[in-house]
């Protein structure tokens, strides 16, 4: 038995301590984890410095932000765990009840998933978010961090397990796979005897590898080729504010805009204003400017590189924005449906008909009208921290909170009935 299999077996053996814990016990464990995380801040920051030093020069600046921890972010992680503790416990919720003509009483009840596996890349905060959500939803959790963030993840998990050790929940219910090589990931993908669910969080390559190779049931958290369409009837002040936020607030995250579509009737006047905001104003403020990849029509109005064949199918995760002009809301919808990963897409318009057409025909997990796509987030949706953004339709779609991490079973109460 490999070390990875041993860790999977430990999690499976410990799951009953979580599955059978009541709400008070789980909340007490989460609060202890949050306190322990803050108490271990110095150790976590030291580990994070190791990750940052190893990554220096090997990843883009925008990706470094995903990896970076500081005191404020550790406090935010701890507060995120406390926020999960404050959420209603979904386990045990009665979803439906019915009584059959023969007198059988049927109750559909929400239950824990069992053991959840998470494979993720260079975001240390996912470690605490995933642990908190899995444990509150009644499941043990097996984490597999990417190499870039492994030292940070190890220090975070050590702190969380120290918190669990003060409670009735077995610390073995939280595991961090030590094997950061490819084989560690593939063992999790094949671990049908140990894992009830596997969730990948990361880039397109990771997600594709898990979806194509896993025998464990998977919820796909897709990449975010996120579009915003500026309609000819848009309020320009709203449009400029929304585009600025959606592209520049955190370009390295999956709900950041990657493609801008602009109605051709306003492109000549709107795009130069946008260029001033995203390029010259940011340079003057000492901020990284946005670099444009332009279709031929957009290139007539602002400066940038000519868009290549793949630029409208790329999740840049950087200060890069692909820009295209379109002749109508119908063309915008066609382009989005052709290139979208069905994560988050939005329209800016004051035209109700255009907005209704867009929301009806765009088949994404989150569809926005006159708002930034950066709101596609479990915390912003009132779900607490999230396990990821599901872009599939079965079981879960959009930000995955506690309810999306549970299953259900039927309890059938009889008085001696037999089937004729």
Swiss-Prot record:
Catalytically driven reaction(s): L-glutamate 5-semialdehyde + phosphate + NADP(+) = L-glutamyl 5-phosphate + NADPH + H(+)
PROSITE patterns reported in the protein's UniProt record: PROA
Subcellular location: Cytoplasm
Enzyme class: oxidoreductase
An MF annotation (GO) of this entry: glutamate-5-semialdehyde dehydrogenase activity
Keywords carried by this UniProt record: Amino-acid biosynthesis, Cytoplasm, NADP, Oxidoreductase, Proline biosynthesis
Pathway(s) per entry: Amino-acid biosynthesis; L-proline biosynthesis; L-glutamate 5-semialdehyde from L-glutamate: step 2/2
KW Lipid metabolism (keyword) present: no
Disulfide topology: none
First-listed, main subcellular location of the protein, grouped into a coarse class: cytoplasm
Single GO cellular component term: cytoplasm
Keyword Transit peptide: no
InterPro entries: Ald_DH/histidinol_DH, Ald_DH_C, Ald_DH_N, Aldehyde_DH_dom, G-glutamylP_reductase_CS, Glu-5-SA_DH, GPR_dom
Pfam families found in the cross-reference section: Aldedh (PF00171)
Enzyme Commission designation: 1.2.1.41
GO biological process, one term: L-proline biosynthetic process
PANTHER family: DELTA-1-PYRROLINE-5-CARBOXYLATE SYNTHASE (PTHR11063:SF8), GLUTAMATE SEMIALDEHYDE DEHYDROGENASE (PTHR11063)
Family: Belongs to the gamma-glutamyl phosphate reductase family.
Function as written in the Swiss-Prot or TrEMBL entry: Catalyzes the NADPH-dependent reduction of L-glutamate 5-phosphate into L-glutamate 5-semialdehyde and phosphate. The product spontaneously undergoes cyclization to form 1-pyrroline-5-carboxylate.
NCBIfam families on file: PRK00197.1, proA
Protein name: Gamma-glutamyl phosphate reductase
Natural source organism: Neisseria meningitidis serogroup C (strain 053442)
Gene (name only): proA
């Amino acid at each position: 038995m490999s070390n990875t299999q041993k860790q999977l077996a430990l999690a499976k053996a410990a799951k009953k301590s979580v599955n059978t814990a009541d709400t008070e016990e789980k909340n007490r464990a989460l609060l202890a984890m949050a306190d322990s995380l803050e108490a271990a801040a110095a150790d976590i920051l030291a580990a994070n410095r190791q990750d940052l030093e190893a990554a220096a020069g090997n990843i883009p600046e925008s990706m470094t932000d995903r990896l970076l921890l500081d005191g404020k972010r550790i406090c935010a992680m701890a507060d995120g765990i406390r926020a999960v503790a404050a959420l209603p416990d979904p386990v045990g919720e009665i979803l439906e009840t019915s009584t059959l003509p023969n007198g059988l009483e049927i109750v559909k009840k929400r239950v824990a998933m069992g053991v959840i596996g998470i494979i993720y890349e260079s975001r240390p905060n996912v470690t605490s978010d995933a642990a908190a959500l899995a444990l509150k939803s009644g499941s043990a959790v097996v984490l597999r961090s990417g190499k870039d963030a492994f030292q940070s993840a190890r220090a975070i998990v050590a702190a969380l397990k120290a918190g669990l050790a003060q409670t009735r929940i077995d610390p073995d219910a939280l595991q961090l796979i030590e094997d950061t090589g490819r084989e560690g990931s593939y063992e999790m993908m094949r671990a049908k005897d140990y894992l009830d669910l596997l969730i990948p969080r990361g880039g397109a390559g990771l997600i594709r590898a898990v979806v194509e190779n896993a025998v464990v049931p998977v919820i796909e958290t897709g990449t975010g080729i996120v579009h915003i369409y500026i309609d000819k009837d848009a309020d320009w002040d709203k449009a400029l504010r929304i585009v600025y936020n959606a592209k520049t607030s955190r370009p390295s995250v999956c709900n950041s805009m990657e493609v801008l579509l602009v109605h051709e009737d306003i492109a000549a006047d709107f795009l130069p204003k946008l260029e001033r905001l995203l390029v010259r104003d940011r340079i003057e403020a000492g901020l990284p400017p946005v670099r444009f990849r332009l279709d031929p029509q957009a290139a007539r109005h602002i400066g940038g590189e000519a868009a290549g064949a793949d630029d409208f199918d790329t999740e840049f995760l950087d200060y890069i924005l692909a820009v295209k002009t379109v002749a109508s809301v119908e063309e915008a919808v066609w382009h989005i449906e052709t290139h979208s990963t069905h994560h988050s897409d939005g329209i800016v318009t004051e035209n109700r008909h255009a907005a209704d057409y867009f929301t009806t025909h765009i088949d994404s997990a989150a569809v926005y009208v006159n708002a930034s796509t950066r709101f596609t987030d479990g915390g912003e949706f009132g779900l607490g921290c999230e396990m990821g953004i599901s872009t599939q339709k079965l079981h879960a779609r959009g930000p995955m909170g506690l309810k999306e991490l549970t299953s259900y079973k039927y309890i059938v109460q009889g008085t001696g009935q037999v089937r004729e």
